[in-house]
A protein has these predicted regions:
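Phosphate-group recognition and catalysis centered on beta-loop-alpha active-site segments
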Residues: 1-275
Length: 275
């Protein structure tokens, strides 16, 4: 079985919500910083606004990042893109605060595609309401196709039914099945993870680092999956990812991780072609 696996000397370094250790997550500032920091790509979260426009934000509410009360799905995209989502970062991380961060707003997915479509983009669909997942999947597929990015966008989600819908609509778009800390780690087997990924037709398996085991990786690769790990913010996880031959690591600090690879991986560890 082949799922278009991409092999190379080292895992890709993907900015998790951009360079989110040093700039407000899921903002242009974080995405630009990740690109400037030699990340191979960026990762972001999308939700549907009330008017059906995919917007880039992790939480279901605005409380944490916009410092105002409200639910994302209860607001139109025009309202959401006016929300400032950087001041919270300055307050929580004064060491990395910048005055300009306070003016960062919620981007739309279309804006991200227009600005960063030359690089690899992992789009995580967030939707707790199962009834709305087909609409979110359709909107992401339509934007990906409209921008000609089927070869550079990978759609991922914990909601595997949403990934099945993406594959039904657009078999050419790669998808990644997410598995997080909520899985019962002492009990879950690699076989269960692989079976779940196969059921939704995923191309890649994205594991929380607590689920990263050699047997799982080998089993997944034997079934044709690429394997990813999140969130890797220390050299320990980079060494592990390299040793296991993972496709990518998701990190909040891409500059630090890229520099570590550059200085510790023998041979050509520079940026590789994104598939």
């Amino acid at each position: 079985m082949s799922r278009g696996r991409i092999n190379d000397r080292r895992p890709l370094v993907i900015g998790h919500r951009g360079a989110s250790a040093y700039a407000p997550e899921n903002t242009h500032a974080a995405f630009r910083m990740a690109m400037d920091d030699a990340a191979d790509g960026i990762e972001l979260d999308v939700r549907l606004a009330r008017d059906g426009v995919p917007v880039v934000i992790h939480d279901a509410t605005l409380d944490r990042t916009a410092l105002v009360r409200g639910e994302v799905e209860s607001c139109d995209s025009t309202e959401l893109t006016e929300c400032r989502v950087g001041e919270w970062f300055n307050l929580r991380h004064p060491k990395h605060a910048q005055e300009s961060f306070a003016y960062e707003s919620i981007p739309t997915l279309a804006q991200v595609f227009e600005s960063y479509g030359s690089r690899l983009i992992y789009v995580e669909m967030k939707c707790e309401d199962a009834a709305r997942r087909p609409s979110l999947a359709r909107a992401v597929v339509e934007l990906t196709r409209a921008h000609g990015l089927a070869g550079r966008v990978v759609v991922k989600s914990f909601e595997h039914d949403a990934l099945s819908e993406v594959k039904r609509l657009a078999p050419e778009i790669r998808t990644a099945a997410l598995f997080g800390r909520s899985w019962p780690r002492p009990l879950v087997s690699g076989a269960r993870i692989i079976a779940a990924a196969e059921r939704c037709g995923a191309d890649e398996i994205s594991l929380h680092r607590s689920l990263l085991r050699k047997s799982t990786v080998e089993g997944a690769r034997g079934r044709g999956f690429d394997v990813l790990v999140w969130t890797a913010n220390s050299p320990f996880w980079l060494r592990r990812a390299f040793a296991l031959g993972l496709r990518a690591v998701f990190t909040d600090c891409p500059a630090d991780m890229h520099n570590w690879y550059t200085h510790h991986i023998p041979g050509d560890a520079g940026r590789r072609e994104n598939g």
